[in-house]
A protein has these predicted regions:
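Internal alpha/beta core interface subdomains
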Residues: 1-6
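Conserved nucleotide- and phosphate/pyrophosphate-binding catalytic cores
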Residues: 8-225
């Protein structure tokens, strides 16, 4: 660091300053970094706003106050109030949500932060009523996507056919049918039966259909452009 400061002074003839920051460590003292799987990038092409948001959502309870103080511009009285509320109901992870929201807003802007938070809620089981286009586009960057022609969807596509589309949610139509028969397939949050047909009526914002298999396996059907 000092070498870089000196090089700038010698080459450009003007002073430079360096900022040093204490190493981030896990509660057990392990350094947080790429070797521990904790690497994130500011570049949205390397770490999407959704992934960035989730990184902060996964903050350990023991460190959430520290990170709120270090990585947001919130007043400390607001930080302390959030932590106190979190300690009363830790399962709701409200302090982590505040940290994720503020850190993502600072790096990616308010719109992407809101879309990332909404996408996170969807992918963790919240109802999709009123879901925004931006949130669905954020989801599309994180889950398998099945492109469907408008004409095919207008005619109706059996749910099993969609699930077994190449690189989507099941490896075969038989697996898709079994998942549906067992009650484990949802279209736009509603459980579907063996005869269910996905049609244009299912479209969200005239372009997307959200499909879930089991508790956490999501896919997005998207109309071809």
């Amino acid at each position: 660091i000092l070498g870089g400061v000196d090089l700038i002074r010698r080459v450009h003839g003007r002073p430079a300053w360096a900022l040093a920051w204490p190493l981030l460590t896990a509660p057990d003292g392990t350094k947080l970094g790429k070797t521990t799987g904790a690497r994130i990038w500011l570049d949205p092409d390397r770490t999407s706003p959704y992934q960035f948001f989730q990184h902060w959502m996964n903050t350990d309870d023991r460190q959430v106050r520290q990170f709120l103080a270090q990585f947001t511009l919130l007043p400390m009285d607001e930080v302390d109030a959030a932590v106190a509320s979190h300690e009363e109901s830790p399962g709701r992870r409200e302090a982590q949500r505040l940290l994720a929201r503020e850190a993502t807003r600072l790096v990616h802007g308010a719109d992407d932060a809101l879309a990332a938070e909404e996408a996170s809620a969807i992918l963790f089981g919240s109802p999709i009523d009123g879901v925004s286009v931006a949130a669905l586009e954020a989801v599309a960057r994180e889950v398998p996507v099945c492109e469907v022609a408008r004409g095919d969807l207008a005619a109706g596509v059996p749910a099993a056919d969609l699930l077994s589309s190449p690189n989507f949610l099941t490896a075969s139509k038989g697996e898709a049918r079994r998942a549906i028969a067992q009650g484990g397939v949802y279209v736009n949050g509603e459980r579907v039966g063996e005869e269910h047909v996905v049609s244009a009526d299912s479209l969200l914002h005239d372009r997307y259909v959200l499909v879930r298999k089991g508790k956490r396996s999501f896919g997005l059907v998207r109309l071809e452009a």
